[in-house]
């Protein structure tokens, strides 16, 4: 299995960061198999969604509706409302597995691989790409 860890700067505000180009670079020319993407953090996840046209902002707004930044959370260290960040991976999992055909990601026309990070307390994230040959 081939693997690589990249560092992604997400900043201090909730963000949806497109990492498709990095994933495409990793699988370029590797043949057929599966790309497994994993975020080794308790407060971030991965989504395969359309970016641009407002979809990434819509996802963040939906997460705000489902997981408000308020004092309802029992997990209370960090910034106010930080407990919601620890619930995020239950809705936006920290992994995705995608087909690779002839060294190219087999994504749909409008699909992108996105790191979803609502935790402004940790502006630097690691993402692990692993290629499993077919």
Regions found by a protein language model. Name each.
Residues 1-134:
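Active-site histidine-anchored catalytic micro-motif
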């Amino acid at each position: 299995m081939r693997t690589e860890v990249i560092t992604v700067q997400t900043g201090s505000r909730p963000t949806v960061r497109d990492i498709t180009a990095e994933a495409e670079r990793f699988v370029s020319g590797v043949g057929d198999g599966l790309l497994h993407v994993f975020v080794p953090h308790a407060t971030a996840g991965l989504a395969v969604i359309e970016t641009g046209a407002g979809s990434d902002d819509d996802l963040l707004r939906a997460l705000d509706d489902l997981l408000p930044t308020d004092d309802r959370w029992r997990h209370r260290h960090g910034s106010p409302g930080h407990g919601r960040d620890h619930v995020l991976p239950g809705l936006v999992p920290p992994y995705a597995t995608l087909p690779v055909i002839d060294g190219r990601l087999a994504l749909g026309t409008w699909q992108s691989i996105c790191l979803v990070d609502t935790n402004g307390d940790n502006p630097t994230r690691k993402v692990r790409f692993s290629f499993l040959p077919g």
